């Protein structure tokens, strides 16, 4: 594994990316990839988005974020593209981000609608665009009664 060394000790990242956080696990995984491509479903305030962008800026990666709400102002970067859309509208999203279809993604992060059937649909739709040795991370799934 060829891992790039990144300094996690700069504020505010130090608190956000402690050794055991899901953000640290994802960034450590992404550092094993050359110019990682990240597909993020769910932005809200942009916490994970900004961590992904920070990493992409360090290593020449790319972040594609989709949210049903307009979250376009949570960040600004040449390494980030945002699309306001339902994350199940795969054809529309791919028409706006054709690079996903052409090149694939290293990491899919699902943090949009947390209902288990929605998460299942997302995985079924987007799995084929995941690169070999890529990963899917899911934040908070509602359990059934």
Spans of features found by a protein language model:
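A short alpha-helical cap/connector motif
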Residues: 1-109, 113-145
């Amino acid at each position: 594994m060829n891992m790039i060394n990144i300094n996690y000790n700069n504020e505010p990242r130090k608190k956000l990316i402690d050794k055991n956080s899901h953000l640290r696990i994802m960034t450590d995984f992404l550092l094993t990839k050359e110019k990682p491509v990240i597909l993020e479903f769910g932005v809200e305030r942009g916490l994970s988005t900004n961590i992904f962008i920070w990493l992409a800026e360090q290593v020449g990666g790319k972040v594609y974020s989709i949210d049903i709400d307009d979250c376009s102002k949570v960040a600004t970067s040449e390494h980030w593209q945002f699309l306001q859309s339902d994350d199940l509208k795969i054809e529309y999203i791919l028409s706006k981000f054709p690079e996903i279809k052409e090149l694939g993604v290293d990491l899919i992060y699902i943090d949009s609608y947390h209902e288990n059937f929605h998460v299942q649909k997302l995985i079924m739709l987007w799995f084929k665009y995941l690169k070999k040795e890529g990963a899917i991370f899911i934040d908070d799934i509602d359990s059934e009664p």
